Amino acid sequence: LHMDHRLIDSCGLVVMIEDLFQLYTHYRYGTACPQELVDFETVLKKDLAKAGNEKRFAKDKKFWDDQLDALGEPLYSDIQGPSVLEGARKRHGDPKLRASDIEMNELFVAVKDYHLEPYATQNLMDFCMNHQLSMTNLLLLGIRTYLSKVNNGQEDITIQNFISRRSTHDEWTSGGSRTIMFPCRTVISPETDFLSAAYEIQNMQNRIYMHSNYDPALIVDEMRKRYHTPEHTSYESCYLTYQPMPVKVENEMLGTVRQHAKWFANGAATKKMYLTVSHTEDGGMNFSYHYQTAHLEEHDMELLYYYMMRILFKGIAEPDMSIGEIMEQV
């Protein structure tokens, strides 16, 4: 199967694959048909009703506005270091500019995949389980620590993280694409130990999930209104999706059916670097880096992956070590 991501997300794909096998065994062996899908339009109308709820909207807006009130304007960080922001400041004639330009002309994207071995993957998963952390938040910590390291120890880091709005049975079985991205902004000092930093990110993400019905475009609009940033600028260079897709399907007639998923670039994107992390059938994980070739090369992805792994495995081995010490030692 080759699906367009605009039509279906990974959660929808899981349901579809299971249903396809159930349909096969229904026609081949006479087993029951898969359960009826929930009508997509019905779920969409519920979404629109939530969005139109003035009290809910006010709470969501307050959450995002409070972040800006407390922390002020975000600060751009780039995997290529502070020279990128300095270049934007020169182009716009503003030495205090805190956002950088989005590439709008040369949008070609290349892909570089790296495979993490099963035993190493299991170490990360065990750490998450033992400390009640999600893999997403551990990955966010790895990326933000690298960004901090290559940007002279910058403490204020923002990464765009994709989430799936499928918390109910109806949402899970309604098909379509229900992914949405929100900025995960944390200010973490170098004295903070690795585990505490992971919990800081997790606490922020948990709060974001509570307000995930909010339109992310409104967050951008509010920042433009407050900080008067130039058109086509952003505070983020990195985007993350973690997809815990199963690598096998259990079917009552067919037994265990192994499956393999791979993401393809459509050739163009306005995101400078978009990392998708998924599980592989051998028990490992695949790190798929999609990057704009106008400004990035494969070597940039090699450095990012290499240092992400150094940071993560140093951190899980010595969770009491400070973020500053980890950045120095790796």
Identify the meaning behind each predicted range.
Residues 51-61, 75, 127-136, 150-260, ...:
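His-Asp-centered acyl/peptidyl-transfer active-site segments
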Residues 1-18, 106-152, 191, 196, ...:
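Acyl activation and transfer enzymes in specialized metabolism, enriched
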Residues 103-107, 174-179, 280-284:
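Short, flexible turn/loop "capping" segments at secondary-structure junctions
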Residues 20-31, 68-75, 146-151, 186, ...:
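A generic secondary-structure signal for well-formed alpha-helical elements
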Residues 14-20, 155-162, 196, 265-329:
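Extended, hydrophobic beta-loop-alpha segments that form or line the acyl/peptidyl-thioester binding
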